[in-house]
Amino acid sequence: MILPECRLPAGKYRGVLGAVCGQGIKAEQEIRVDEDCLIELPAELLTRVYRELPGDKLVRTAELSLKNGDDFYRCRITLYDPKQKAVPATGTVYSQNGSAGFLVNGKPVGTHSGSLGFWEGRIAGESASRFGGIGIDGSVFLLNAYEFMDSNGQLNRERLQSALNQRMAQITARNPNVYFKIYFHLYMPPAWCKKHPEELIKLDNGTDSLEMAPGKIRQPSYASELWRKQMGTVLRQAIQVFRESPFADRIPYLRLCYANCGEWNHWGYHEHAFVDYSLPMQRAFGKWLKKKYGTEEALRKAWGRDDADFNPDNLVPSRADRLKGGDFLRLGGTETQNSVDYYAFFQEFAAETILYFAKIAKEASGRRLAVGAYYGYYFGHYGSNPYHFQDSGNYGVGKLLHSADIDFIGGPAQYHNRRLQLELNGITGSVNLHGKIWESEGDQRTHLSGEKNKSLGTTDNLSESIAIAKRDFMLNLQRKSSYYFYDFVFDWYRDPEFMTAVGRLREIDSALRSIRRKDHAETAFLFSEETIPYLTSRGSGLLREFVKNQIAELPRLGLPVDYYLMSDLDRIDFSRYKVVLFVNAYYADNEMIRKVQKYAAKKGRTLIFLHAPGVVGDSNRLDPEQSARLTGIRLAVNPDASAAGIRAAWGQMKSAAYRFRTEISDPSVKIIAYHDNGTPAGAERQFSDHKSIVICHPLPNAVFLRGLLAREKIRWLASGKSGLDQVNFAGPLISVYSRSGGAKTLWLTEPAEIVADLFTGEILGKNLKTVNFQMPPRPETRILYAGSAAEYEVFRTANGKD
């Protein structure tokens, strides 16, 4: 072998080959180094050392040192026995004692599922070593299949195997316990794309390139049968390469990646274009329409077009059609129904495309791989019009979650003002309900990320970096999610103190998973995917108001809230909740109303509906009667009138003016809130088995919501007396992230034998229900334990490497 980065003079050296860090076997051997730093190691030496190296994987890591006088050299080498075959690893998802996560070969991974190991030709060896040193062994490994394919779409398996072995060996040398999380990109080679223009996506503005595609060449349509067939074959063959690799016992995980940045965010928004007008997509839409309408007569009636049928090349709605309709809801009946249909179809079709490849991956791996995708960016795309909202195709989560071929979805959080607050990008409660897990991409910027990343969250100093790392950890714990560190191989996390803090978070995570976790959310927020196709594709002041408050206000409620999709009404255990808040239930139908009444409107529970619940249905027209059936409270709806502020006995709020004002028009209800102009903007009605409340605002701020929820006997757990901080909850753990400090008060749900800071060890009190403490006037996160003295010992003495 040739010694890497070797400057030794030629000669004989005392060689020692053994376990990494001197733990275990050490075998000595005289070794000659020639002028090219080439050495020979006897086979019997390698065999003896290999057999005694620690670990149960086929590929193992040894350390070689050479010494002669003052000349010294050390490197790591990976060894394996070619006569043996690695048993392919297994990856699964589990939920136990109130916690959730991945299992790799039956062993729990923990909330921290890995770090970036290989990206765009660069290997993060030192980073892998540092993360491995604190027990974070997952290595995100980006694989561009097209790099190993020819212009006919054929995979060169030998080249792929050689590249995998070389790259994985380098990472394994840095972390002997590593396992690999393969991010498999489904792009076709640019040469293939040039040969098959009829299979590629088609942009409405005539642009013939894609900013984020390989070579900026247009890529295949989601609906291209040729792409699906050929890439499906490549995926099967690649998985077979994984299974035959000496690293097979280190590959438990596969993430399917396509479209912009591999995140299944459909092409077009960088090009300011609507897509996809390719013939394959036109035909796929036609098949969906035939399934929905059955006959061309029914389609023509729904669309108001005498020329409509299921087979033409102009079914996908034009730019003009997509931009028709109201400033908020499309409405318009037949005039905009083609756009409603297309966006309903496309959410399903995007999810189905992922499932097509997920099924192949599961079958090819003997169902041993954990399989998932970037998907379900509910908040990240919401209202980002045009090109980025419904066009992302990210609102088919309900379909994905019902499939046994998907184990996880996830992605990065929203990037806006991350230093101020953070929420995960998906509806995590529903993901957990279906036995899956949301896996966040933890691309936290630190003080080492540079000025060019300032708008994405670069911190001012180490202290702020650690504060945000602690906050993000607790947010993922609360949402029962996993996450991995993703620094684009720029080594943002290299600060020793930062890594020490992450190591302590690992210990806290290990302790929490060893006990039975009891969460205390009394409120559930329900979000609708069914509503998405009915919302405008234009810029909307109302949608901007929603997004602003979702980003800036919901993380500051100071009480635990669980998030679910409305499609899971029949799965949610509502017995846990006093209040169910329907955030954006603009669309409703008879079945949805039936489920709300059957599952949620029971046992004295309060149902809160925001803004314009149930005002649109399958007719794609305003339907106040349907709204009244959903809520029991009548509304007047004026799409052309503006609204802004709202006031009530518990508080008031100002907001930017937005069109589409709703007002209470029911004389039989109790009015509880008003618009700025004095018209009724909130009402309640008491039924025999539940209470219904309507608030005529798209999403009130944190102060208003806290007051409303307190009115319904929902307890605040954080006072907010020195500012509304981001407070997160996970079993007996509470974290407070404050940027300005001051006096803080927490009210516990039950008395705690001990309250302690899990980083400093400070005991804040014993046998108390109210906790008072101070925080410094700078960004800081305190993670507190509040519970029994016996369980506190578990956290105090935890080992994150267990």
Predicted feature descriptions by range:
Residues 47-61:
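Short glycine/proline/serine/threonine-rich loop/turn segments at secondary-structure transition edges
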Residues 124-211, 230, 239-243, 356-364, ...:
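Aromatic-lined substrate-binding rim segments of carbohydrate-active enzymes
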Residues 194-406, 427:
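Polysaccharide-binding and catalytic clefts of secreted carbohydrate-active enzymes
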Residues 465-467, 583-802:
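A conserved amphipathic helix/loop scaffold
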